Amino acid sequence: MSAAPARPAPGLARGARTKPSSRSAIDGTPGRSSRRRPRRGDLNVRDAGAFTKLIEIPIARGVARAAVAPAKKFFLDGKRTSEREFANTTVRAPDTDLAEYERAPMQALSGYDVGEVPFVMQAVCYYEETLDVGVLERGLRATLAKYPMLAGRLDLRVPGWQNKGVKLTNDGVPLRVIADDDLKFEDLPQDYASETRRFLDFSPWIDVMLGDAPLFTAKVTQCAGGGSVLGVCMSHAVSDGQGFIEFLVAWSKAANGEAHPWGDPVFDRTLVSQPEPGQSVEDMRAMLSAEGFDNVPSVPMLGGALMAGRTLVPDFLRFPAGNRMMVSVNTDNLRNLREASGASNDNEALSAHSWLALADLCELPRGTPLEHVTVVSGRGGRTGLPDMYFGNAAIGVCTGRVSVGDYDSLAEVRDGLRPGFTKAMMRRNKYLMLTEAAFRAGVNGFDFDIMAFMQGQMCWCNNLVEIYKKLYDLDFGGGGPSLALPPELNDIVQIQCSRPDRSTGAPAGANGVEMFINLPPATMEKMRRPEAIERLAGARGIR
């Protein structure tokens, strides 16, 4: 299955403007109800990136450690008192000494990386064969030799994006092993919910920002009677989801004495499309304003997110654990969606379907803005970054600046979004440059309406089929996982490959896709109605 014409990649990506788009992103002709909120320009740009900027203030760092940390441990880390810890190991890069934080060399981060500091990616994999922790540890140690920044700690203290990075201290990665005598493998939950977060060891974002916590954690839960759960977390500051997955692939290969088939990771941030040399912050802000990157002050942006039901959890602003819902779009329904839409590939059909279904089911008044945004990878192809680039290179692009009622059929939605997809891919290097400039200049301005995104009033569609199918290839010596639960990202519509069917032996991806819908809790009540689930699954209401 084709992941997308634009090779979508994961994470809370930022992107660039596809001017003024809707019916035609190429010629600029507006759609039937295309609307834009009033331009805010440079208003309050200095409010952007408030969390990162606080770390630059010594007294703020002290307050965070002395006052916030104890409360954070109580509210965010969850209960561990009932866990029976079997082992707790710190894994470090081999043949490398520990380095004092102040004197350790620094691996530079991009402005985009720094903007992603509060966010955490995670994945959970179920293994029917009990994992050999010794094999995991040896493989992880060998992999850290090629990914030394994951054994380091963030340093955000000095003002200026160019002064922030990862101190290569080799403090290491925690690998914890829990023995759960009451948990049987067959009783493991089949999707993310509040109970599945127990399989993860989060490094709370405050600790990560302070440089007090690891950038990657691994936790193994050994089940009663055999079987294991592997839960992993990685800070979004060091990479997006594609880099995350390729690291996991490298780990599993190293556990078997093999190298990653694509070679070694690439860390060089100068490969990312850059603003013009010598361009001042004021120049970048003027350029961004001309491109329509309208700044939103941090306080109202976060306030809107909290009002919509997002919560401050260890991996920053998310809708509550278990809020999202998985809907299976089987092979037959996916074929029907392609035929009804006239799409040239599955991603195009699913993008049109998800927008039209949400426009129907959210019960928003006709004419209400409901942008369609897709996520494009800056990697690959003749002009893209290397496939093994380890950093943030996924960009969110508004492929349809449209409103409820603009389109009445899948074919109309496809026609409306297609120019946006084409333009997004053709200009992805420019979009990546604008994204980098936005974070360097401290502007909370993106191609899409960030307030609408935070409030969940948008069709943010991230197709991760090809990338996260690789989770099923994570073989540490006893075979791949029987189920790999994908990251609980901020995506409103996240598309994954279908899970393996144990009854038929069908592998992952053989029976269509799984769509994960993650809207505000109040809206999710509407999505959970039986008729809404059938609509989202492509089993009814297709037109």
What are these regions (language model features)?
Residues 291-302:
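Intrinsically disordered, low-complexity regulatory tails flanking kinase catalytic domains
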Residues 6-7:
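Short, low-complexity disordered leader/linker segments with a strong preference
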Residues 326, 335-336, 347, 389-473:
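Helical lid/core segments from catalytic subdomains that handle acyl or acyl-like groups
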Residues 2-3, 14-17, 23, 27, ...:
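Non-catalytic N-terminal regions of enzymes
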Residues 305-316:
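Acyltransferase donor/substrate-recognition loop-hinge adjacent to the catalytic core
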Residues 119, 123, 300-307:
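A compositional signature for long Ser/Thr(±Pro)-rich, low-complexity
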